[in-house]
């Protein structure tokens, strides 16, 4: 046996040991490795015992998929595997200590972080992006959200679970740089409650937070943020917030998801489900409430890179927004339990009947099945959420406590710190057409988020 073959087997053996604690998964669509993932995860080779040929075959097939689907290099695949090994080790250690009190990192609303907490988090995000190692770790993670993911992780039941796993990887990457940082969530219902005329004046689009809201981002911690070549019409991160296209997360939708006793199964709030509750806007237009639909509206509202599938994660806002979507889902899961429903088994299977099937391998994370994203493991072992309170919002310089004990965003009033960056030449004016819920295509990547509403 030559040295390279031996080293390759050692690496794969280490990988198999590292994921030995992983949730079982079986790929029913690939006959040549059917059942292999589950068998490999159940077994843990001892000492110098070689990994079985079937296990080697299964994981080499995964590596081939990642290369063909995402065009990842060997270094990028190894990087993602290393994040998974760390995550599974964390889960395993927490399970071993389940009878003891275990501290879990707390995800809070971004504006309720202390000044130091927020600066540390934003600096760590910037450090992940600006790292010059090969591969660039931020770009590798962002590329997991490229076009091949669209039919697997959007427009159906797997949207929630896939993005939950995706956030976990991203947070693990941040904590490698600084171990005490935790993701925060951007609750855009605080913007919604300002009223439509004031949405764009929210203080988060300032140098203290996310930077300017239009044009190339030239202020704040994410200024002069390079984009991979050819991804958009711009070489740098840009936004294009425009009134009448998209909107913040509707607080009426959030209230229904949190409290309506008639929406207690996932089919009532997932894309292509039967949708129980509706919202009627000021023009008399009615839409069903789904978490994914409300999520799409925020992408369209921020615009720019956020308005299209491929470049969306290049804007750090993406992860703060999706952290809120995950928070909303967790609040819904808590409501399900109050009504004696089990969120871990209530997988509706809406969307593409094959790719969103409960037992289909989760694209990009093939050691999970889609239904594994609905597990309680994440909020029991990796993180938990803290809901905003009016008392906390009262003491924050970026929020106020409004009527009905609702937290509302503070504003940068017109004429105060509303800097805009250079406009993107030939950049898309609108990501999507609202009429008919159809997509307008970007000149560079052709994929966006379907809008569900364009006004209050």
Swiss-Prot record:
Keywords: Copper, Metal-binding, Secreted, Signal
Positions of Cu cation B binding: 295, 299, 322
Annotated positions binding Cu cation A: 145, 154, 163
Tissues with expression: Prismatic layer of shell (at protein level).
Cofactor: Cu(2+)
Compartment list: Secreted
UniProt keyword Signal, yes or no: yes
GO molecular function: metal ion binding; oxidoreductase activity
Gene3D superfamilies: Di-copper center containing domain from catechol oxidase (1.10.1280.10)
Pfam family, any one: Tyrosinase
Phosphoprotein found in the keyword field: no
Predominant localisation class: secreted
GO CC, alphabetical: extracellular region
Signal peptide extent: 1-22
Listed InterPro entries: Di-copper_centre_dom_sf, Tyrosinase/Hemocyanin, Tyrosinase_Cu-bd
Cofactor note: Binds 2 copper ions per subunit.
Coiled-coil blocks: none
Superkingdom field: Eukaryota
PANTHER family, sorted: TYROSINASE FAMILY MEMBER, TYROSINASE-LIKE PROTEIN TYR-1-RELATED
Entry's family note: Belongs to the tyrosinase family.
Protein name according to UniProt: Tyrosinase-like protein
Source organism per UniProt: Pinctada maxima
Lineage: Eukaryota, Metazoa, Spiralia, Lophotrochozoa, Mollusca
């Amino acid at each position: 046996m030559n040295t390279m073959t031996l080293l390759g087997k050692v690496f794969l053996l280490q990988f198999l040991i590292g994921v030995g604690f992983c949730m079982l998964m079986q790929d029913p669509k690939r006959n040549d490795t059917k059942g292999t993932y589950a068998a490999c995860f159940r077994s843990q080779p001892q000492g110098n015992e070689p990994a079985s040929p079937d296990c080697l075959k299964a994981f080499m097939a995964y590596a081939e998929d990642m290369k063909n689907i995402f065009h990842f290099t060997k270094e990028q695949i190894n990087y993602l595997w290393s994040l998974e090994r760390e995550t599974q080790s964390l889960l395993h250690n927490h399970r071993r200590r389940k009878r003891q009190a275990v501290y879990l990192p707390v995800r809070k609303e971004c504006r309720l972080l202390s000044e130091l907490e927020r600066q540390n988090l934003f600096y760590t995000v910037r450090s992940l992006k600006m790292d010059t190692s090969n591969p660039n770790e931020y770009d590798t993670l962002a590329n997991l959200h490229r076009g091949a993911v669209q039919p697997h992780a959007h427009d159906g039941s797997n949207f929630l679970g896939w993005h939950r796993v995706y956030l976990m990887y991203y947070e693990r990457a941040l904590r490698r740089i600084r171990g005490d940082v935790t993701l925060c969530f951007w609750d855009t219902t605080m913007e919604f409650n300002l009223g439509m005329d004031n949405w764009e004046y929210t203080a988060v689009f300032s140098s203290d937070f996310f930077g300017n809201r239009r044009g190339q981002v030239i202020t704040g911690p994410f200024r002069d943020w390079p984009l991979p070549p050819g991804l958009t019409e711009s070489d740098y991160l840009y936004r294009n917030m425009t009134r009448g296209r998209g909107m913040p997360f509707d607080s009426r939708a959030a209230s229904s998801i949190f409290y309506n006793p008639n929406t207690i199964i996932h089919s009532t709030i997932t894309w292509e489900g039967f949708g129980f509750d509706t919202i009627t806007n000021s023009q008399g237009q009615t839409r069903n409430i789904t978490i994914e639909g409300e999520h799409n509206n925020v992408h369209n509202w921020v615009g720019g890179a956020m308005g299209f599938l491929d470049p969306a994660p290049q804007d750090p806002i993406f992860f703060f927004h999706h952290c809120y979507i995950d928070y909303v889902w967790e609040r819904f899961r808590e409501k399900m339990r109050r009504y004696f429903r089990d969120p871990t088994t209530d997988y509706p299977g809406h969307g593409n009947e094959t790719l969103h099937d409960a037992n289909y391998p989760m694209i990009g994370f093939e050691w999970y099945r889609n239904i594994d994203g609905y597990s309680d493991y994440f909020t029991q072992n990796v993180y938990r959420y803290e809901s905003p309170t009016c008392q906390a919002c009262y003491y924050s310089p970026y929020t106020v406590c409004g009527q009905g004990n609702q937290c509302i965003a503070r504003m940068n009033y017109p004429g105060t710190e509303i800097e805009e960056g250079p406009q993107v030449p030939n950049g898309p004016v609108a990501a999507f057409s609202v009429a008919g819920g159809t997509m307008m295509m970007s000149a560079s990547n052709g994929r966006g988020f379907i809008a569900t509403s364009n006004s209050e």
